[in-house]
Amino acid sequence: MNVLLSPQPPLFQHPHETNRISPSRSLSPFHNMSTSRKRKADEDGDEMSMSPRSSPAASSRQLQRPSKKVRSNELVGRPLTLPRLLETLDPTALRTVLERICERHPDIGQEVVNSAPRPTVAAAHGVLQEYQDKMKAAIPYGETSPDYTYYRVKAPMTALIDALLDFTPQYLPPNETQTTVSLQYMDGATKIIHALPDWEPQQYRHHKENAYDEISKAWALVINEAAKRGGGLSLHTGGWDQTLAKHHEISGGRMGTAMNAMATSVSWMAHGGSSNGQQPGNPSSDQNSILNQLMSGTYGAPVRVGPW
Protein backbone atom coordinates (compact mmCIF):
# COMPACT_ATOMS: atom_id res chain seq x y z
CA MET A 1 0.00 0.00 0.00
CA ASN A 2 1.27 3.31 -0.96
CA VAL A 3 1.68 5.78 1.86
CA LEU A 4 1.36 9.47 1.06
CA LEU A 5 4.08 11.44 2.82
CA SER A 6 4.47 15.15 2.91
CA PRO A 7 7.38 16.24 0.87
CA GLN A 8 10.45 16.87 3.03
CA PRO A 9 13.76 18.18 2.08
CA PRO A 10 16.31 15.57 1.44
CA LEU A 11 18.40 14.61 4.36
CA PHE A 12 21.64 15.34 2.57
CA GLN A 13 22.15 18.53 0.68
CA HIS A 14 24.28 19.13 -2.27
CA PRO A 15 27.87 19.78 -1.26
CA HIS A 16 27.97 23.09 -3.19
CA GLU A 17 24.88 24.34 -1.44
CA THR A 18 26.42 24.47 2.03
CA ASN A 19 27.54 28.07 1.54
CA ARG A 20 24.36 29.24 -0.07
CA ILE A 21 22.07 31.24 2.15
CA SER A 22 18.52 31.87 1.30
CA PRO A 23 17.72 35.55 0.92
CA SER A 24 14.44 35.05 2.67
CA ARG A 25 15.97 33.41 5.67
CA SER A 26 18.55 34.63 8.14
CA LEU A 27 21.02 32.50 9.89
CA SER A 28 20.18 33.67 13.38
CA PRO A 29 18.70 36.63 15.24
CA PHE A 30 22.18 37.46 16.57
CA HIS A 31 23.37 37.96 13.06
CA ASN A 32 20.80 40.70 12.48
CA MET A 33 21.68 42.34 15.79
CA SER A 34 25.40 42.46 15.02
CA THR A 35 24.71 43.78 11.55
CA SER A 36 22.50 46.56 12.83
CA ARG A 37 25.04 47.47 15.48
CA LYS A 38 27.79 47.59 12.90
CA ARG A 39 25.73 49.77 10.64
CA LYS A 40 24.86 52.09 13.50
CA ALA A 41 28.50 52.40 14.47
CA ASP A 42 29.39 53.19 10.89
CA GLU A 43 26.66 55.80 10.72
CA ASP A 44 27.85 57.33 13.99
CA GLY A 45 31.35 57.48 12.57
CA ASP A 46 30.04 59.19 9.48
CA GLU A 47 28.13 61.71 11.57
CA MET A 48 31.20 62.43 13.65
CA SER A 49 33.23 62.91 10.53
CA MET A 50 30.59 65.32 9.21
CA SER A 51 30.47 67.33 12.46
CA PRO A 52 32.50 70.60 12.40
CA ARG A 53 33.69 69.97 15.92
CA SER A 54 35.30 66.69 15.03
CA SER A 55 36.98 67.93 11.85
CA PRO A 56 40.80 68.15 11.96
CA ALA A 57 40.72 71.74 10.77
CA ALA A 58 38.43 72.79 13.60
CA SER A 59 40.51 71.03 16.19
CA SER A 60 43.65 72.67 14.89
CA ARG A 61 41.96 76.06 14.98
CA GLN A 62 40.86 75.56 18.54
CA LEU A 63 44.38 74.69 19.59
CA GLN A 64 45.88 77.79 18.02
CA ARG A 65 46.50 80.65 20.43
CA PRO A 66 46.08 84.31 19.49
CA SER A 67 49.18 85.47 17.72
CA LYS A 68 51.34 88.12 19.38
CA LYS A 69 53.67 90.62 17.76
CA VAL A 70 56.99 88.96 18.37
CA ARG A 71 60.19 90.60 17.30
CA SER A 72 62.12 88.49 14.91
CA ASN A 73 65.31 87.09 16.31
CA GLU A 74 66.92 87.54 12.94
CA LEU A 75 68.59 90.95 12.63
CA VAL A 76 68.14 92.52 9.21
CA GLY A 77 69.26 96.00 8.24
CA ARG A 78 66.41 98.33 7.35
CA PRO A 79 65.91 102.12 7.31
CA LEU A 80 64.12 104.01 10.06
CA THR A 81 60.42 104.64 9.86
CA LEU A 82 59.31 108.19 9.10
CA PRO A 83 58.37 109.13 12.70
CA ARG A 84 61.71 107.87 14.03
CA LEU A 85 63.60 109.63 11.27
CA LEU A 86 61.92 112.95 12.01
CA GLU A 87 62.90 112.61 15.66
CA THR A 88 66.56 112.66 14.70
CA LEU A 89 66.37 115.90 12.68
CA ASP A 90 67.12 119.22 14.31
CA PRO A 91 65.09 122.28 13.23
CA THR A 92 67.72 123.35 10.69
CA ALA A 93 67.88 119.95 8.99
CA LEU A 94 64.09 119.66 9.04
CA ARG A 95 63.72 123.07 7.37
CA THR A 96 66.25 122.06 4.73
CA VAL A 97 64.35 118.87 3.91
CA LEU A 98 61.03 120.71 3.80
CA GLU A 99 62.44 123.43 1.54
CA ARG A 100 63.74 120.86 -0.93
CA ILE A 101 60.39 119.08 -1.03
CA CYS A 102 58.57 122.37 -1.60
CA GLU A 103 60.97 123.32 -4.38
CA ARG A 104 60.34 120.05 -6.20
CA HIS A 105 56.59 120.19 -5.56
CA PRO A 106 55.27 123.78 -5.68
CA ASP A 107 51.76 122.64 -4.78
CA ILE A 108 53.06 121.28 -1.48
CA GLY A 109 54.87 124.56 -0.87
CA GLN A 110 51.65 126.50 -1.38
CA GLU A 111 49.86 124.14 0.99
CA VAL A 112 52.50 124.81 3.64
CA VAL A 113 52.08 128.57 3.18
CA ASN A 114 48.31 128.29 3.51
CA SER A 115 48.43 125.96 6.52
CA ALA A 116 51.22 127.55 8.55
CA PRO A 117 50.16 130.05 11.24
CA ARG A 118 51.02 133.70 10.80
CA PRO A 119 54.45 134.49 12.27
CA THR A 120 54.26 136.58 15.40
CA VAL A 121 56.41 139.65 15.98
CA ALA A 122 58.29 137.83 18.73
CA ALA A 123 59.04 134.93 16.37
CA ALA A 124 60.36 137.26 13.67
CA HIS A 125 62.51 139.15 16.15
CA GLY A 126 63.83 135.84 17.47
CA VAL A 127 64.99 134.79 14.01
CA LEU A 128 66.64 138.16 13.43
CA GLN A 129 68.33 137.88 16.82
CA GLU A 130 69.86 134.56 15.76
CA TYR A 131 71.31 136.21 12.64
CA GLN A 132 72.64 139.03 14.77
CA ASP A 133 74.33 136.58 17.15
CA LYS A 134 76.06 134.92 14.20
CA MET A 135 77.30 138.29 13.00
CA LYS A 136 78.69 139.15 16.44
CA ALA A 137 80.37 135.74 16.67
CA ALA A 138 82.20 136.46 13.40
CA ILE A 139 83.89 139.59 14.74
CA PRO A 140 87.58 138.76 15.27
CA TYR A 141 89.23 139.22 18.65
CA GLY A 142 92.02 141.65 19.24
CA GLU A 143 93.32 144.46 17.10
CA THR A 144 92.73 143.78 13.41
CA SER A 145 92.60 145.89 10.31
CA PRO A 146 89.22 147.31 9.23
CA ASP A 147 89.41 145.43 5.95
CA TYR A 148 90.03 142.10 7.65
CA THR A 149 87.19 142.69 10.11
CA TYR A 150 84.81 143.73 7.36
CA TYR A 151 85.38 140.64 5.25
CA ARG A 152 85.04 138.43 8.30
CA VAL A 153 81.68 139.98 9.18
CA LYS A 154 80.37 140.70 5.69
CA ALA A 155 78.64 137.35 5.04
CA PRO A 156 76.67 137.08 8.32
CA MET A 157 75.92 140.82 8.25
CA THR A 158 74.51 140.56 4.73
CA ALA A 159 72.45 137.54 5.78
CA LEU A 160 71.03 139.55 8.69
CA ILE A 161 70.06 142.51 6.52
CA ASP A 162 68.52 140.26 3.87
CA ALA A 163 66.44 138.46 6.50
CA LEU A 164 65.29 141.77 7.97
CA LEU A 165 64.21 143.10 4.58
CA ASP A 166 62.44 139.82 3.80
CA PHE A 167 60.47 139.87 7.06
CA THR A 168 59.46 143.53 6.82
CA PRO A 169 56.77 143.23 4.06
CA GLN A 170 54.99 140.60 6.18
CA TYR A 171 54.10 143.32 8.70
CA LEU A 172 53.18 146.09 6.29
CA PRO A 173 49.69 146.97 5.05
CA PRO A 174 47.65 145.63 3.45
CA ASN A 175 49.08 142.26 4.50
CA GLU A 176 49.05 143.37 8.15
CA THR A 177 45.92 145.27 9.11
CA GLN A 178 46.80 146.03 12.75
CA THR A 179 48.88 149.17 13.02
CA THR A 180 50.23 148.27 16.45
CA VAL A 181 51.62 144.96 15.19
CA SER A 182 53.37 146.72 12.30
CA LEU A 183 54.89 149.34 14.57
CA GLN A 184 56.06 146.76 17.10
CA TYR A 185 57.90 144.85 14.41
CA MET A 186 59.56 147.95 12.97
CA ASP A 187 60.58 149.15 16.42
CA GLY A 188 62.53 145.94 17.02
CA ALA A 189 63.90 145.85 13.47
CA THR A 190 65.17 149.42 13.77
CA LYS A 191 66.98 148.55 17.00
CA ILE A 192 68.76 145.73 15.16
CA ILE A 193 69.86 148.17 12.46
CA HIS A 194 71.23 150.48 15.14
CA ALA A 195 73.49 147.61 16.28
CA LEU A 196 75.08 147.13 12.86
CA PRO A 197 78.78 148.04 12.80
CA ASP A 198 79.77 151.59 11.95
CA TRP A 199 82.66 150.93 9.61
CA GLU A 200 85.49 153.39 9.52
CA PRO A 201 85.98 153.26 5.74
CA GLN A 202 83.12 155.12 4.12
CA GLN A 203 82.70 152.53 1.35
CA TYR A 204 81.68 149.88 3.91
CA ARG A 205 78.84 151.91 5.40
CA HIS A 206 76.40 151.48 2.54
CA HIS A 207 74.95 148.31 4.10
CA LYS A 208 73.72 150.13 7.19
CA GLU A 209 72.61 153.24 5.30
CA ASN A 210 70.55 151.18 2.87
CA ALA A 211 68.94 149.35 5.79
CA TYR A 212 67.99 152.67 7.40
CA ASP A 213 66.52 153.88 4.13
CA GLU A 214 64.34 150.77 3.71
CA ILE A 215 63.08 150.71 7.29
CA SER A 216 62.33 154.44 7.15
CA LYS A 217 60.12 153.87 4.10
CA ALA A 218 58.36 151.08 5.97
CA TRP A 219 57.68 153.38 8.92
CA ALA A 220 56.27 156.00 6.55
CA LEU A 221 53.94 153.48 4.89
CA VAL A 222 52.48 152.35 8.21
CA ILE A 223 52.19 155.92 9.50
CA ASN A 224 50.33 157.09 6.39
CA GLU A 225 47.97 154.13 6.63
CA ALA A 226 47.34 154.79 10.32
CA ALA A 227 46.61 158.44 9.57
CA LYS A 228 43.62 157.31 7.51
CA ARG A 229 42.13 155.68 10.60
CA GLY A 230 41.15 158.16 13.22
CA GLY A 231 43.48 160.83 11.94
CA GLY A 232 46.53 159.09 13.34
CA LEU A 233 45.25 159.25 16.91
CA SER A 234 46.73 155.83 17.72
CA LEU A 235 50.20 157.06 16.74
CA HIS A 236 50.13 159.81 19.35
CA THR A 237 48.34 157.98 22.14
CA GLY A 238 50.64 154.98 21.75
CA GLY A 239 53.71 157.17 21.99
CA TRP A 240 54.95 156.07 18.59
CA ASP A 241 55.77 159.63 17.58
CA GLN A 242 58.23 159.82 20.46
CA THR A 243 59.60 156.35 19.69
CA LEU A 244 60.27 157.32 16.09
CA ALA A 245 61.91 160.58 17.16
CA LYS A 246 64.30 158.61 19.35
CA HIS A 247 65.16 156.24 16.49
CA HIS A 248 65.76 159.25 14.26
CA GLU A 249 68.19 160.68 16.79
CA ILE A 250 70.11 157.40 17.25
CA SER A 251 70.39 156.88 13.50
CA GLY A 252 72.02 160.25 13.04
CA GLY A 253 69.10 161.75 11.14
CA ARG A 254 68.67 158.86 8.67
CA MET A 255 64.95 158.36 9.39
CA GLY A 256 63.88 161.53 7.61
CA THR A 257 61.23 159.89 5.42
CA ALA A 258 59.45 158.43 8.43
CA MET A 259 59.74 161.66 10.41
CA ASN A 260 58.12 163.66 7.62
CA ALA A 261 55.22 161.21 7.48
CA MET A 262 54.78 161.40 11.24
CA ALA A 263 54.87 165.19 11.24
CA THR A 264 52.15 165.28 8.61
CA SER A 265 49.98 162.75 10.43
CA VAL A 266 50.10 164.29 13.91
CA SER A 267 50.50 167.94 12.96
CA TRP A 268 46.93 168.66 14.01
CA MET A 269 47.77 167.33 17.49
CA ALA A 270 51.01 169.21 18.07
CA HIS A 271 50.99 172.85 17.09
CA GLY A 272 54.36 174.46 17.05
CA GLY A 273 56.17 171.14 16.75
CA SER A 274 57.77 172.33 13.54
CA SER A 275 57.36 176.09 13.90
CA ASN A 276 59.51 176.43 17.02
CA GLY A 277 62.15 173.99 15.86
CA GLN A 278 61.06 171.20 18.20
CA GLN A 279 60.49 167.67 16.93
CA PRO A 280 57.02 166.17 17.17
CA GLY A 281 56.53 164.20 20.29
CA ASN A 282 58.72 166.33 22.59
CA PRO A 283 57.24 166.95 26.06
CA SER A 284 57.19 170.74 25.56
CA SER A 285 55.08 170.45 22.43
CA ASP A 286 52.69 167.98 24.10
CA GLN A 287 51.50 170.78 26.40
CA ASN A 288 49.91 172.59 23.46
CA SER A 289 48.53 169.53 21.67
CA ILE A 290 44.84 169.47 20.88
CA LEU A 291 44.61 166.00 22.40
CA ASN A 292 45.81 167.25 25.79
CA GLN A 293 43.39 170.17 25.59
CA LEU A 294 40.52 167.80 24.91
CA MET A 295 41.53 165.56 27.80
CA SER A 296 41.85 168.49 30.23
CA GLY A 297 38.69 170.24 29.05
CA THR A 298 40.47 173.45 28.09
CA TYR A 299 39.89 173.13 24.35
CA GLY A 300 38.05 176.22 23.05
CA ALA A 301 38.66 178.25 26.21
CA PRO A 302 39.48 181.95 25.71
CA VAL A 303 43.18 182.68 25.49
CA ARG A 304 44.47 185.45 27.72
CA VAL A 305 46.40 188.16 25.93
CA GLY A 306 48.67 190.63 27.65
CA PRO A 307 50.68 190.63 30.84
CA TRP A 308 47.69 189.88 33.11
Curated annotation (Swiss-Prot):
Binds the proteasome. GO terms for biological process: nuclear protein quality control by the ubiquitin-proteasome system; proteasome localization; protein transport. This is Tethering factor for nuclear proteasome STS1. It comes from Colletotrichum graminicola (strain M1.001 / M2 / FGSC 10212). GO terms for molecular function: proteasome binding. The keyword Amino-acid biosynthesis does not apply. The gene is STS1. InterPro entries: Cut8/Sts1_fam, Cut8/Sts1_sf. Residues 20-35, 276-290 have a biased composition (Polar residues). Involved in ubiquitin-mediated protein degradation. Regulatory factor in the ubiquitin/proteasome pathway that controls the turnover of proteasome substrates. Targets proteasomes to the nucleus and facilitates the degradation of nuclear proteins. Gene3D superfamilies: Tethering factor for nuclear proteasome Cut8/Sts1. Pfam families: Cut8. It is found in: Cytoplasm; Nucleus. Keywords: Cytoplasm, Nucleus, Protein transport, Transport. Residues 1-75, 269-290 are annotated as: Disordered. Belongs to the cut8/STS1 family. One of its GO terms (cellular component) is cytoplasm. Residues 48-61 have a biased composition (Low complexity).
